[in-house]
Amino acid sequence: MKKLPLLASALLVSLLAACGGGGDDPDPTNLNSAFTITSATDTTLNGAYGSANTPLSGVNKLERVGATDLCSFTFENIPRAGGGAVAEGTVEYLVDSSTVRRLVLKLAGGTYESTGAGVSAVSRANNNVTFTGSVLSAGTPTVTITGTIPMRSDRPSSC
């Protein structure tokens, strides 16, 4: 009898490992993303990025003890026009607010991050997040992002 719970646990672990740990990976959508990277320390990253079917994860609500709750989603495979770099990342924003808390952007092997993502706004009505001249850094290297990243409409309440 003791083998049954052990077998069930092993089966569950195998299934979760097979599907990436049970997380919500980005799936292609019919939502448009369009942004530009400017003033990059690595000038090969500068340019227009966009996708007509941006891969997005679902929006997750993160309940935090002693701090304002957050909403978070990921995006991936947003190519630069003309080839080269491909963008992916994570957007975190405060619940019941248009305030972006953090943007993490991965480009050409570098991870650029902003806490207090500059001039940015979450628009629940338009299902997107807009950035206007937001500076992100990877230590000393920096990039500036201006444009829009979509988010799914089937979000948890307050997100």
List each model region and its residues.
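An extracellular/secretory-lumen and virion-surface interaction module
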Residues: 20-159
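C-terminal motif of bacterial Sec signal peptides marking the signal peptidase cleavage site
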Residues: 15-18
